[in-house]
Amino acid sequence: MKKIGLIVVGIIVILGGALLYLNHMNYWPFHKDKEKGIPDGEIKNMNQLDRTDELSLLLAASGKVGYNVKGSNVSIYFDVYKRDKRVLHKLVTEFGSEKDTQLSGTLVWGIPGFDVFKPTEIRAAISNDGATSQDSFAIPKDIFGKIDNAGAQTQPFEDGKIKKGKKYILQGWIMGKENIGMNEDTFSEKGFKNQEQTVILYVVFK
Protein backbone atom coordinates (compact mmCIF):
# COMPACT_ATOMS: atom_id res chain seq x y z
CA MET A 1 0.00 0.00 0.00
CA LYS A 2 2.83 2.38 0.87
CA LYS A 3 4.48 1.64 -2.47
CA ILE A 4 1.25 2.42 -4.33
CA GLY A 5 0.96 5.68 -2.40
CA LEU A 6 4.48 6.69 -3.43
CA ILE A 7 3.70 5.88 -7.06
CA VAL A 8 0.54 8.02 -6.92
CA VAL A 9 2.45 10.90 -5.35
CA GLY A 10 5.14 10.57 -8.02
CA ILE A 11 2.55 10.67 -10.80
CA ILE A 12 0.92 13.75 -9.26
CA VAL A 13 4.29 15.52 -9.02
CA ILE A 14 5.13 14.71 -12.65
CA LEU A 15 1.71 15.80 -13.92
CA GLY A 16 1.86 18.95 -11.81
CA GLY A 17 5.29 19.80 -13.19
CA ALA A 18 4.12 19.17 -16.75
CA LEU A 19 1.06 21.39 -16.29
CA LEU A 20 3.18 24.17 -14.79
CA TYR A 21 5.53 23.98 -17.77
CA LEU A 22 2.64 24.06 -20.27
CA ASN A 23 1.19 27.08 -18.47
CA HIS A 24 4.56 28.88 -18.35
CA MET A 25 5.18 28.31 -22.05
CA ASN A 26 1.57 29.17 -23.00
CA TYR A 27 0.86 25.79 -24.57
CA TRP A 28 -2.60 24.20 -24.86
CA PRO A 29 -4.86 24.00 -22.87
CA PHE A 30 -3.69 27.28 -21.32
CA HIS A 31 -3.86 30.79 -22.79
CA LYS A 32 -5.19 30.03 -26.27
CA ASP A 33 -4.91 33.73 -27.18
CA LYS A 34 -1.12 33.81 -26.68
CA GLU A 35 1.80 32.76 -28.86
CA LYS A 36 2.64 29.15 -28.03
CA GLY A 37 6.09 28.24 -26.75
CA ILE A 38 6.93 31.75 -25.51
CA PRO A 39 6.66 32.74 -21.81
CA ASP A 40 4.81 35.93 -20.84
CA GLY A 41 6.81 39.11 -21.37
CA GLU A 42 9.39 37.46 -23.63
CA ILE A 43 10.66 37.61 -27.21
CA LYS A 44 11.73 34.54 -29.20
CA ASN A 45 14.28 34.69 -32.00
CA MET A 46 13.03 32.30 -34.66
CA ASN A 47 15.95 33.17 -36.96
CA GLN A 48 15.58 32.85 -40.72
CA LEU A 49 12.49 31.56 -42.47
CA ASP A 50 12.45 27.94 -43.56
CA ARG A 51 14.84 27.78 -46.50
CA THR A 52 13.23 24.59 -47.82
CA ASP A 53 10.43 26.74 -49.21
CA GLU A 54 11.28 27.59 -52.83
CA LEU A 55 9.79 31.07 -52.44
CA SER A 56 12.16 31.85 -49.55
CA LEU A 57 15.08 31.31 -51.92
CA LEU A 58 14.09 34.58 -53.58
CA LEU A 59 14.96 36.48 -50.39
CA ALA A 60 18.44 37.84 -49.76
CA ALA A 61 17.68 37.89 -46.02
CA SER A 62 14.66 37.08 -43.87
CA GLY A 63 13.61 36.38 -40.32
CA LYS A 64 10.83 35.67 -37.87
CA VAL A 65 10.22 36.78 -34.28
CA GLY A 66 7.59 35.64 -31.76
CA TYR A 67 6.46 37.56 -28.69
CA ASN A 68 4.04 37.67 -25.72
CA VAL A 69 3.97 41.01 -23.92
CA LYS A 70 1.66 43.59 -22.37
CA GLY A 71 2.06 46.77 -24.37
CA SER A 72 0.55 49.25 -26.79
CA ASN A 73 2.72 49.05 -29.88
CA VAL A 74 5.05 46.89 -31.99
CA SER A 75 6.99 48.89 -34.59
CA ILE A 76 9.62 48.06 -37.22
CA TYR A 77 12.03 50.83 -38.24
CA PHE A 78 14.84 51.37 -40.74
CA ASP A 79 17.68 53.66 -39.60
CA VAL A 80 20.89 54.90 -41.21
CA TYR A 81 23.84 56.28 -39.20
CA LYS A 82 26.89 58.21 -40.35
CA ARG A 83 29.23 57.43 -37.49
CA ASP A 84 27.01 58.02 -34.43
CA LYS A 85 24.72 60.56 -36.14
CA ARG A 86 21.37 59.24 -37.32
CA VAL A 87 20.64 60.61 -40.80
CA LEU A 88 17.56 58.55 -41.68
CA HIS A 89 14.72 57.16 -39.55
CA LYS A 90 11.78 55.50 -41.32
CA LEU A 91 8.83 53.44 -40.10
CA VAL A 92 8.39 50.20 -42.07
CA THR A 93 5.19 48.98 -40.39
CA GLU A 94 3.58 48.83 -36.95
CA PHE A 95 0.75 47.30 -34.95
CA GLY A 96 -0.71 49.07 -31.95
CA SER A 97 -3.55 50.40 -29.84
CA GLU A 98 -4.24 53.49 -27.74
CA LYS A 99 -3.66 51.69 -24.44
CA ASP A 100 -1.75 48.68 -23.14
CA THR A 101 -3.18 45.33 -24.13
CA GLN A 102 -1.97 41.77 -24.65
CA LEU A 103 0.32 41.69 -27.67
CA SER A 104 0.88 38.10 -28.78
CA GLY A 105 1.97 37.03 -32.22
CA THR A 106 4.79 36.99 -34.72
CA LEU A 107 6.50 39.32 -37.11
CA VAL A 108 8.14 38.22 -40.34
CA TRP A 109 10.31 40.23 -42.67
CA GLY A 110 12.21 39.71 -45.87
CA ILE A 111 14.50 41.45 -48.34
CA PRO A 112 13.69 40.42 -51.94
CA GLY A 113 16.66 39.63 -54.15
CA PHE A 114 19.86 37.62 -54.02
CA ASP A 115 22.46 40.02 -52.58
CA VAL A 116 22.06 41.20 -48.99
CA PHE A 117 24.52 44.03 -49.72
CA LYS A 118 22.36 45.43 -52.53
CA PRO A 119 18.89 45.58 -51.00
CA THR A 120 16.21 47.68 -52.68
CA GLU A 121 13.14 46.85 -50.62
CA ILE A 122 12.05 45.53 -47.24
CA ARG A 123 8.76 43.74 -46.65
CA ALA A 124 7.38 43.10 -43.18
CA ALA A 125 4.21 41.82 -41.52
CA ILE A 126 3.19 41.91 -37.86
CA SER A 127 0.45 39.48 -36.77
CA ASN A 128 -1.41 39.80 -33.49
CA ASP A 129 -4.40 37.70 -32.38
CA GLY A 130 -5.58 37.12 -35.94
CA ALA A 131 -5.03 40.68 -37.19
CA THR A 132 -2.11 41.59 -39.46
CA SER A 133 -0.32 44.82 -40.33
CA GLN A 134 1.97 44.60 -43.33
CA ASP A 135 3.83 47.00 -45.57
CA SER A 136 6.88 47.43 -47.78
CA PHE A 137 9.62 50.03 -47.70
CA ALA A 138 11.67 51.14 -50.70
CA ILE A 139 15.30 51.64 -49.66
CA PRO A 140 16.82 54.90 -50.98
CA LYS A 141 19.32 54.21 -53.78
CA ASP A 142 22.21 56.17 -52.26
CA ILE A 143 22.59 54.04 -49.10
CA PHE A 144 24.21 50.83 -50.35
CA GLY A 145 27.01 50.11 -52.82
CA LYS A 146 29.07 53.27 -52.34
CA ILE A 147 31.20 52.16 -49.36
CA ASP A 148 33.56 49.17 -49.39
CA ASN A 149 34.27 46.62 -46.64
CA ALA A 150 30.67 45.87 -45.72
CA GLY A 151 29.42 43.30 -43.23
CA ALA A 152 25.92 42.07 -42.38
CA GLN A 153 24.24 40.24 -39.52
CA THR A 154 20.73 38.80 -39.09
CA GLN A 155 18.84 38.88 -35.78
CA PRO A 156 21.86 38.86 -33.41
CA PHE A 157 19.72 39.05 -30.24
CA GLU A 158 18.86 36.18 -27.87
CA ASP A 159 15.54 34.99 -26.46
CA GLY A 160 14.54 36.64 -23.19
CA LYS A 161 12.50 39.24 -21.35
CA ILE A 162 11.35 42.12 -23.54
CA LYS A 163 12.71 45.54 -22.60
CA LYS A 164 10.34 48.29 -23.70
CA GLY A 165 12.04 50.78 -26.00
CA LYS A 166 15.01 48.51 -26.78
CA LYS A 167 16.01 48.08 -30.42
CA TYR A 168 15.94 44.38 -31.34
CA ILE A 169 18.01 44.15 -34.52
CA LEU A 170 16.41 42.19 -37.37
CA GLN A 171 19.09 42.98 -39.94
CA GLY A 172 22.18 45.15 -39.61
CA TRP A 173 24.90 46.33 -41.98
CA ILE A 174 28.25 47.99 -41.25
CA MET A 175 30.37 49.75 -43.88
CA GLY A 176 33.74 51.46 -44.05
CA LYS A 177 37.50 51.01 -44.05
CA GLU A 178 37.45 50.77 -40.25
CA ASN A 179 35.42 47.56 -40.42
CA ILE A 180 36.69 45.67 -37.36
CA GLY A 181 34.24 42.78 -37.35
CA MET A 182 31.05 42.34 -35.37
CA ASN A 183 30.45 41.94 -31.65
CA GLU A 184 27.77 42.73 -29.06
CA ASP A 185 28.53 46.47 -29.34
CA THR A 186 28.39 46.68 -33.14
CA PHE A 187 24.82 47.96 -33.31
CA SER A 188 24.98 50.27 -30.30
CA GLU A 189 25.82 53.96 -29.86
CA LYS A 190 29.37 52.88 -29.03
CA GLY A 191 29.64 50.69 -32.12
CA PHE A 192 28.25 53.32 -34.48
CA LYS A 193 31.27 55.55 -33.83
CA ASN A 194 33.61 52.87 -35.18
CA GLN A 195 31.89 52.60 -38.57
CA GLU A 196 31.70 54.99 -41.50
CA GLN A 197 28.07 53.96 -41.97
CA THR A 198 25.69 51.66 -40.10
CA VAL A 199 22.24 50.59 -41.28
CA ILE A 200 19.76 48.79 -39.03
CA LEU A 201 16.33 47.24 -39.43
CA TYR A 202 14.85 46.68 -35.98
CA VAL A 203 11.70 46.16 -33.92
CA VAL A 204 10.70 48.11 -30.80
CA PHE A 205 8.02 47.26 -28.24
CA LYS A 206 6.25 50.05 -26.34
Descriptions of predicted regions:
Residues 4, 49-51, 62-63, 157, ...:
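Short secondary-structure boundary micro-motifs
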Residues 19-102:
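N-terminal export/targeting and maturation segments
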Residues 91-206:
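Extracytoplasmic electrostatic interaction patches
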